Every structure is written in structure tokens, then in C-alpha cells.
């Protein structure tokens, strides 16, 4: 990382009721002694054996044949990560050389392949959530996975659907998609399909309830935080996107660090055996997050199949598991199933034939063979992905698009490229080291970990980041555009109160909101950046603000300033950040992104704002009670009639769209019975849950002056539930003067609620509200869908 000033050293130090019950009581209020912290999550045993059904039948058959040739010691060896011979892998399972099984190499995947050179840095999860583009997301996953395959890596450790974004200040929210289960599920499922169609195992993470970084791991005699989630909330929010990814065929799921209802997630039998492997019919293997194992064979009995990165509890080669089999405390069939699930996933992706040799290096500081994994065909996907995650939320006085300005003034620490992106920080990146402080001398404000002040932010920090081959920073791209347009530029990237040429046609201000793994954010805005915006706006009547943000960033400190004419949430675009932004600023392409979360006016508008901290008598057992249930983000704002600054699903374009011709109907012969028909369990749950029950259709017309993409959104009011819930979206490109018909299919699951009493999804009889429009609060088309009668 290079030398750090004392302030940076401080920053570096800072870096260093049961699921079946009707609800969760506040845990701190019912504790009488520490025995409370045991048995809060109901036991579900035995761990189901791999079904081997449907599309997995062939892989399962091959795996059974191969595993049957292994000794018990060899089977156990497959289940434990290796601390030696990694050769650049972040994790590596055991191997069986005599049977030509080389082991499974795993690497992180948030922005692309981590801990290596000659790969691309892709738009982040939150950026793709803001794109609302399923097809683009698929191609991002496919092309990204192609780089993993070229490097000989078997498993991409992504996508992320947990954290779900419950806590706005959550440090890893940027790796996930959004705060809505439907949107998150659809975007993540497309990511899984893309990754696995390229022949790479997708590892969906983190299962489950991993909603804060603070106290995510045990420390000393203090346990990891317990996410206390009731049955209904679990199914309707947190489990929902996992079901979508399993339905898409996900071959791996990673269990999380936190405790779930006071049982560590990686040894929680209700979660792994009950929800994942039984209810969702998961065919693949469960791998622990790195260092998340806290039990011996009990974790295997609870459904864990692979421990990473190594384990003394299971033994270096799994010898403690074989000993447990020998003494009868672990069933031999369980160990065999663990090995079978691993090998079947390998076969399912076709990795047994012509899979590339490992193309990583154990050290990049010594001579090594270079393997360039970048495919030129990825370039348009990288650029489109970068563009479509930008969200324009304000544009007055025709501020945008820019039209060959004579003079632009550019301000803010986020405009240039960071001063460092070298081989030393490919292992565990902090947003390409943009977090290192600039020598900002004209302000006493402590910016702490709120911003990355050393250059433009293209990704958050931690294991989800990687080393980009280049960064197109906003200032770089603006200079190139200035050359083409003969525009003159002034710039100041360090001052909080810069001089401003009064003749500037526009003043562009660049700031960011940063977060990283291992810590949560200090807040949702920072005084330094807000002061900068207000100071520039006081001197420039056409101030355009771009924020590269990891998630929710409040703007009410300056959003109504009359001289702030345009505001863009740029999210985390990856390596093509500046190139993409300039195309949008100058109207080569229209903005098309939509917010995947709600921007409030105040922190207090969020019913859950901060992470949970230890309190009460038993501070060694931190509790986080998810007592808000399903009412998060826009669902809560709607229920309480809170006016947001910018609502979920909001985003402007350079044109105008008109919605018309809403129609809806129940599919003929579809079952609308209260309980779903009894069907087989497929990947993702009971087959009947995926049956299409109803269809909705609407027309979107481009009445403006520029071709652009619009995201048509369908919301449904399910009886006894939130006011409305997202249940469909389609992104369509519509030329000027033309129209597009958007069609939405509603499955039984989409229209159902989870019944704790029935332990089933149930379809209420009656009238369902239907809304279609451009955001969660701009819904010009309204109607009703009648289920089960008139």
C-alpha cells in the first residue's frame, strides 16, 4: 500500500424465535441466563442426500460412480480446503490424483477475478441492480466467468444476495443487487445462468441473514451477531432471492459468518438442511465462508459440505470426519453425500473435459507465466454495463446533455484516477486503493472511512474488489471530449472551497460514498463532500454533481440548491467509468438506470438504519432482531406514507414515456387454490410455485425527442401484505415516436404469501391491486386482478 500518514494509519487500524415460529420476540428482553442462546433454531436432521433429479441426473450418476471408487479418507479429503499448494487460488478443495480429480479452485468474483493480473474489472452488483437489465446482467456473468475459465478456476464466489441491504450503512451492500427480493432474485438468477453457461460454478452468498459487518465474526468471548428472523420474513424477503438462484441451477451456496436465531449459519440445520436442501431442493454443495466454521462433525450433519480455507476442526485432510464415521457419530452416507455433491457440481459444469490448467501465480513479484484472460468481445458488455447503472435523479434548466461547452470547471476528489493501483494491492483491494488520503489541507473535517478521497471509486473495498487493467476516470474522459469539442477546462481536485471561473458553462463536481468488507459505513453522507458541493454551487449557477456510491447516499444537504441543476448516482461502474459517464453527459446515450433502493430525506426515515451492537447483560451474545418483518425500504415508506427524496425505481432519461393499455388476466386452467397443488420439489422449491397464474400487459410509448430505454415496473398489492410489491420489470429500448408492449408473467409464488400456520405458500382469494409505471410512486396505470372468483 505504500507509506501512510498518521491519519491513514488510524484508518488502517479501523479496517483491521425460531424459523418455524410465528414471530421473534426482542431477544434482549427475555434473557434470564445464557441457556437462552441455545436451541433457538429448530433442529432439522438428517441432511438430505443429493436428489440428482432433472438436469442434474447425468452429473449425479457420474459423481456416484466416481465417489464409489474413493476410500473414505479420500472422500473426507475433498471436503476440506488446503492451506498449501494453492497456486493463487483463494480456496482449494482436496484432490484424488489417482482418479484424475484435481480439486476445486475457488476465487472471488464481485467485480471480476481477484488476486491476479490481466483480467477486467466489471460493474459491481449494486450497479447491475441499478441497471434493471436482465439480459445485460446475463452477459456480464457469462463474459466474467469466461475469464475465470481461461485462468483455470472452477468456482466464482458470487453473486451476492446477502447482504440484502437491510441496514443502509452495511459495509458490503455494494456487492449485492438492491433492497427488493424480486429485483435481487431476478438479477442474481441471470448472473448465475451466465456464469454457469460459461462452465463455471456460481457460489451464491452469503446464506443467510448476513446483514451487517459489525460483529459478523466472534472475537474473544463475544459471539458473532445473531440475526433473529421470523419464519414469514425469512421466506418473503431473505430466502426469496436464494430461491431464484437455486431455480437457475446454482451449483454452490456459501454459508455466512453470522449466527441465525443464535445458531451459527454454517452449522444451522434448519437453514441448510431444512430451507436450502429440503424446501428449495438444492442439488449442489454448501461451502463455508472463510473461517466461518465453529464446529466439528456437527456442522457436517447440519448440512455443510465443504469448509474453507482449511480446518483444524475437521482435520487437515478431513481425518476428524473419518474418525467420526468410524465411531458412529457421523453417518457414512453423510460424508459420501458431501463428496458426491462436490463432484456432481464439477461434472454439471463440464469441468471434467478439456478444462484449462490453472493460470494463476503464487507470486506476481517473481517471474511467472502470464495468462491474459481478457476477451475483446467483452468490451461492449463492460461499457454498456457501466452506462446502464448510472441513475439521473435531477435535471433542470436543460443542464444535461452538455452541448459542446466552451468552458468547464471540474472539482472533487473523485474526478481523477487514484494515485496507485499496483501489484501490491491485488490481494485484498480497498477500491483500487482510492481510500488513501489526499493531502487535503484546507478543511478540519474528519472524512474517516466515509469517502475514498484518493481518486475515482470504481468498486467498494474488500474481497469483492479486483485489480483493473486500466481505469477510465471521469477527468480522463472529459479531457478527451474537451479535445474533440475544443473545450477549455479548469480543475481542482483537493480544495473544499475552490475558486470558480464565473464564465464556466457548467461546473462538474465529483464525490463518492465508500464502504468495504469488515466494517460498516459511519453514515450516509459526509460533511466534506457536502460542503464542497454547496461551495461550488454558491459560485456556479450550473453545478452538476456525480456521486460514485456504494449504495444509499443522502443528498438533502444540497439537493434543493437552485444552482445544483443535475445530479447523478453513478454507483460503481468498473474500469469504463469515465468513458461511460461522458457518453451519458453529452447525450450520446440516454440515462436509463433506476434506483434499486429508496433515497430518504433523513436517516430517521429508515426504520432500520444502524447495525445492531451488543447490549444488555449478555453482551457476549450480540442480538439483531429483525422485528420490522417485511417492511423495509419502499414497503415501509409506503406503509407509513413517508415521502422519500427519490423513490425506489426512480430514474430520469432524456426523453418522455407514456404508459397506456393496461390489461391483466388469470391464465386459463391455472390452479388458483389456496394451497399449491402437490408437486415434486425441483430446484427452487415445489414445481407448482413456478407455474404462471396470471399475465399483465401494458404499452409504453416514447413521446420525446431521443431514443432511450425505459424500465417498465409492475407492482402488486397482495392481500394482507405491504401496500405494493415489485413483481415484474422489463427494460425496453424504444425509438422516438414508437411504442413497445411489455408483458409480465406472474407465478403462484409471485402472488402468494407465506403462511406460518400452513408452512406453505398460500394464494389469497380476492382482489389484487395492479400498478404499472416508471417507479414505485409513479404508477399511471392501475387495475385489479381477481383470484378465485368475482
Predicted regions and their residues:
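Glycoside hydrolase catalytic-domain context in secreted enzymes
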Residues: 23-754, 760, 767-772, 776-777
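A short, solvent-exposed, low-complexity linear motif enriched for acidic/polar residues
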Residues: 765-769, 785-787
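Short beta-strand elements
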Residues: 778-790
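Fungal secretory targeting signals
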Residues: 1-28
